[in-house]
């Protein structure tokens, strides 16, 4: 039984070690002589003029958050729709409750005006 999960353990360890090796190599083998010119912001061959950071409106974040929420909904909805014939009534009720909660959240956002672009 434990041998069945050995592959998952090896994969998990590899997934942790694989990104650490290049990061450690870059840290230990890379040059460590920062100068003001090296630390300066550089983009497209032009020197940056003014403040580099641009503050975005909160509406961008609200739309992005709503997109992520409904994208995750699709991730849950697709496998359920594919296996709908074998799942039965309990899975239908569970997904209906899930969709009602998400639609309730969308209606709440709409009523609060979070989806209005001003």
UniProtKB/Swiss-Prot annotation:
- Subunit-structure text: NDH-1 is composed of 14 different subunits. Subunits NuoA, H, J, K, L, M, N constitute the membrane sector of the complex.
The organism named in the record is: Roseiflexus sp. (strain RS-1)
**Class in the EC hierarchy, top level:** translocase
Role, per record: NDH-1 shuttles electrons from NADH, via FMN and iron-sulfur (Fe-S) centers, to quinones in the respiratory chain. The immediate electron acceptor for the enzyme in this species is believed to be ubiquinone. Couples the redox reaction to proton translocation (for every two electrons transferred, four hydrogen ions are translocated across the cytoplasmic membrane), and thus conserves the redox energy in a proton gradient.
| Record's subcellular location | Cell membrane
Q: Which residues form a coiled coil?
A: none
Protein family per UniProt: Belongs to the complex I subunit 3 family.
Q: What is this protein called?
A: NADH-quinone oxidoreductase subunit A
Show the catalytic activity: a quinone + NADH + 5 H(+)(in) = a quinol + NAD(+) + 4 H(+)(out)
User: What membrane topology does the annotation report for this chain?
Assistant: Multi-pass membrane protein
Q: Return the Gene3D superfamilies for the record.
A: NADH:ubiquinone/plastoquinone oxidoreductase, chain 3
A Pfam family = Oxidored_q4
Per the record, its GO cellular-component terms are: NADH dehydrogenase complex; plasma membrane
Q: Which gene encodes it?
A: nuoA
Q: Which GO terms describe its molecular function?
A: NADH dehydrogenase (ubiquinone) activity; NADH:ubiquinone reductase (non-electrogenic) activity; quinone binding
Intrachain disulfide bonds: none
Q: What is its EC number?
A: 7.1.1.-
Swiss-Prot/TrEMBL keywords: Cell membrane, Membrane, NAD, Quinone, Translocase, Transmembrane, Transmembrane helix, Transport, Ubiquinone
Transmembrane annotation, as ranges: 6-26, 62-82, 87-107
């Amino acid at each position: 039984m434990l041998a069945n999960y050995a592959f998952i353990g090896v994969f998990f360890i590899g997934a942790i070690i694989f990104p650490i090796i290049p990061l450690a190599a870059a840290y230990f083998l890379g040059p460590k002589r920062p100068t003001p010119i090296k630390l300066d912001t550089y983009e497209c061959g032009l020197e940056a003029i003014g403040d580099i950071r641009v503050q975005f409106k909160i509406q961008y974040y609200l739309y992005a958050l709503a997109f992520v929420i409904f994208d995750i909904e699709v991730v849950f909805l697709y496998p359920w729709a594919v296996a709908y014939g074998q799942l039965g009534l309990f899975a239908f009720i569970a997904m209906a409750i899930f969709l009602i909660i998400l639609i309730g959240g969308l209606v709440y956002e709409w009523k609060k005006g979070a989806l209005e672009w001003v």
